[in-house]
Amino acid sequence: MNNFANKRKRRIILWLVSVIVIIAVITGAGAIYVNDYYRADSNAITTFATSNTVFTETLDKRTVVYAPEKAKTGFVFYPGGKVEYTAYEPLMKACADKGILCVLIEMPFNLAVLDMNAAEGIMSRYPEIENWYIGGHSLGGSMAASYLSKMLMNLKVLSCSAH
């Protein structure tokens, strides 16, 4: 009996250690995956920032608004998967130069799928905007379209995808 109990105890310990190792490997791989992303080109952002006069407002830690005067059109942008949101800053400033209020949202771990509802509440902050558009690059575009389909709001979708 004692031998049987020892074998059973060893088997349980081996099983538990195996599960812990598998969880650790999966967690480590996930951490490496989400921390390996495309970063913004700081030279492009600096160059564009010096030649741009659009008012920039930070709504919260994750949301930047590029607000031209007297804008009547707004554009909420979801960044592509594993792309640093500031990489889209020159694009947002260029659109704002054309009179469009642009909202750029940083996604958790640079994955829009983790916060599909990031646009929620933004549009109500700007009642002067008559037409709203929502879109994004790649995974961000897909999540913007998913958000729109669930909200059934009077928005237009600009969904950009690259593969």
Named regions from a protein language model:
Residues 107-108, 159-163:
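Active-site nucleophile loop of the alpha/beta-hydrolase fold
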Residues 27-73:
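N-terminal cap/lid segment of alpha/beta-hydrolase-fold proteins
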Residues 135-144:
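Gly/Ala-rich beta-loop-alpha elbow adjacent to hydrolase catalytic centers
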Residues 2-24:
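N-terminal Sec-pathway targeting helices
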Residues 81-91, 107:
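The serine-hydrolase catalytic nucleophile loop
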Residues 72-80:
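Short beta-strand element of the alpha/beta-hydrolase
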Residues 92-112:
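Conserved alpha/beta-hydrolase
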